[in-house]
């Protein structure tokens, strides 16, 4: 395809450009300002001829440039692009970004891309065909289905049609959004590999109509909902010692792990995604994506008009005494007490329950060293340690 790049600040007005020998790319727009000459029949017929390697669909907030070998999957683009536009809108709310974007998000696939990573941080987002749909030699080859991920997955407005690669794609696209990220001063927590999963979480919850627990579970690879993420958190030696969860004796405690972005999903479930957006927005407004933990708790609580310190405390980011004092005048997070009681009830009481919980979490954790340690070193006092920590957090709310 041939695109014209207009430098920022240009004021050239309307200009006619003539290109000899060009073949029109099949294009369809669902955007109100661009669909005056749309003809769905013409679009589908042009795709069938395969005169050019790609077709393009433009939405209000999203552009899709896909190989013509997949065109038979997009003969009815309206519901697909409607779902993608809505997804971009939901991401904007979560991220604290303006509702009106300065340009549309853009996704394309090609047989070869100049990156070892799928969907690298770029404009457009590039995906390699073989990583999405399997072995394909050229973009004109007929592709039977939409492969590991496609915007088609969203059109049904249900998580039942999601494929295994969906959260991976949103993870990579999340890096392009450069979300404000906590834990920088703690060192190597690397939560930038975790909060990118918030894109999938908000889309599954707001666009695909999943409850927040299901959205959290499906947004990462561990298959952890709130209960599993809470148990994973409580089995952290750092958490048991009331220390910031970052790195333990075995591995990073936050990178790629559901318990890292569960704290934000918890806030969204209790107070709404708009509150999450307000937390993120304050960091954009001061011009940084590096969120210090105490600043996050302080400014986030003030934007939410509720003392969020207990939520951060439970999910591995304990507030300092100074932070607690400064937030004492805000309304308490009483909505969180019921959740804490639920997490307390999940704590295993007997050795049999203890081993059952660990084996379940171990099955999908990704790294097993910590779980093997706990299996080999049963401590009957551990459940009391966990309960005491939760009781202290509940007391801080009351």
Residue ranges, per PLM feature:
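Beta/coil-rich, acidic/histidine-enriched accessory regions frequently appended to metallopeptidases
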Residues: 291-398
């Amino acid at each position: 395809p041939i695109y014209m790049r207009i430098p920022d600040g240009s004021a050239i007005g309307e200009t006619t450009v003539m290109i000899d020998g060009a073949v029109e790319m099949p294009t369809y727009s669902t955007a109100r300002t661009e669909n005056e000459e749309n003809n769905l029949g013409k679009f589908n017929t042009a795709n069938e001829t395969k005169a050019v390697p790609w077709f393009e669909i433009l939405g209000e907030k999203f552009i899709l440039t896909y190989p013509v070998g997949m065109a038979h999957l997009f003969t009815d683009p309206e519901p697909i692009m409607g779902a993608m536009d809505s997804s971009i809108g939901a991401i904007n709310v979560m991220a604290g970004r303006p509702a009106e974007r300065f340009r549309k998000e853009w996704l394309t696939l090609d047989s070869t891309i100049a990156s070892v990573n799928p969907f690298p941080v770029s404009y457009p987002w590039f995906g390699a065909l073989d990583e999405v749909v399997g072995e394909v030699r050229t973009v004109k080859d007929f592709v039977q289905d939409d492969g590991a991920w496609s915007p088609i997955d969203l059109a049904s407005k249900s998580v039942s049609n999601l494929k295994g690669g969906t959260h991976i794609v949103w993870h990579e696209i999340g890096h392009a959004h450069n979300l404000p990220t906590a834990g920088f001063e703690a060192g190597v927590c690397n939560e930038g590999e975790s909060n990118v999963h918030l894109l999938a979480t908000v889309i599954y919850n707001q666009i695909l109509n999943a409850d927040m627990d299901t959205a959290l579970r499906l947004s990462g690879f561990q298959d952890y909902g709130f209960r599993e993420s809470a148990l994973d958190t409580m089995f952290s030696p750092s958490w048991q010692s009331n220390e910031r969860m970052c790195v333990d004796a075995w591995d990073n405690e936050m990178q790629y792990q559901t318990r890292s972005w569960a704290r934000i999903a918890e806030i969204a479930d209790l107070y709404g995604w708009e509150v999450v957006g307000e937390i993120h927005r304050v960091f954009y407004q001061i011009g940084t994506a590096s969120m210090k933990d105490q600043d996050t708790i302080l400014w986030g609580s003030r934007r939410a008009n509720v003392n969020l310190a207990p939520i951060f405390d439970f999910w591995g980011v304990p507030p300092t005494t100074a932070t607690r004092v400064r937030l004492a005048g805000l309304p308490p997070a009483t909505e969180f007490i019921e959740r804490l009681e639920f997490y307390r009830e999940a704590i295993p009481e007997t050795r049999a329950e203890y081993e059952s919980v660990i084996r379940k979490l171990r099955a999908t954790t990704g790294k097993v060293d910590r779980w093997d340690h706990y299996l080999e070193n049963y401590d009957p006092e551990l459940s009391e340690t966990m309960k005491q920590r939760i009781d202290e957090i509940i007391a801080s709310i009351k």
